[in-house]
A protein has these predicted regions:
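Short acidic capping loops at alpha-helix termini that bridge into adjacent secondary structure
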Residues: 2-5, 32-34
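Conserved beta-strand segments of alpha/beta enzyme cores
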Residues: 3-6, 59-61
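Short beta->alpha junction loops
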Residues: 5-15
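Active-site-proximal alpha-helix that buttresses catalytic centers in soluble enzyme cores
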Residues: 16-23
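Extended hydrophobic blocks
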Residues: 23-34, 38-145
């Protein structure tokens, strides 16, 4: 039975989503044991890693705000069905996905402890890194810095 809920509305990036939400909880004297993250699907892993950086004892419940499937149609990537209100166009979606791998990778240019230090360590599977390298050849102009 939920009496009160709070929504952080000031942030403009994933890092501030985390720090501002934690600040809000602190201001309200709320000791959170569980946090539900509802975020753009493309940024779910990074958001969770951001919370883990600041408090590894909080149980993070990741809830993607949408689910979509990308298919090949007429030799181009497209959404299988896209009736999601406000959904990115396919190029922006690819750009968001392609931008996440370098951010999640815990190296000197990533966002983890061995890089910029914005998030907790994330172990990116080798097959994901291999797929990313392959896709960079096709979508180099869509990799966000």
């Amino acid at each position: 039975n939920i009496k009160d809920y709070y929504i952080e509305r000031e942030s403009t990036n994933c890092g501030n989503n985390v720090t501002y939400a934690l600040r809000l909880l602190n201001e309200k004297n709320i000791e959170a044991k569980n946090i539900i993250i509802i975020q753009d699907t493309t940024m779910q892993h990074r958001m969770e890693a951001g919370f883990r950086k600041y408090d590894s004892n909080i149980n993070i419940i990741n809830y993607a705000s949408y689910k979509t499937k990308v298919i090949v149609k007429e030799d181009k990537l497209t959404f299988e069905k896209n009736n999601i209100l406000g959904m990115w166009d396919i190029e922006r979606y690819i750009s968001l996905l392609m931008g996440e791998i370098p951010r999640l990778n815990d190296n000197e240019s990533g966002y983890g402890p061995n890089g910029r230090g914005y998030i907790a360590h994330v172990e990116v599977p080798k097959d994901v890194l291999d797929a990313f390298e392959y896709l960079k050849g096709e979508y180099r102009n869509l990799v966000r810095a």
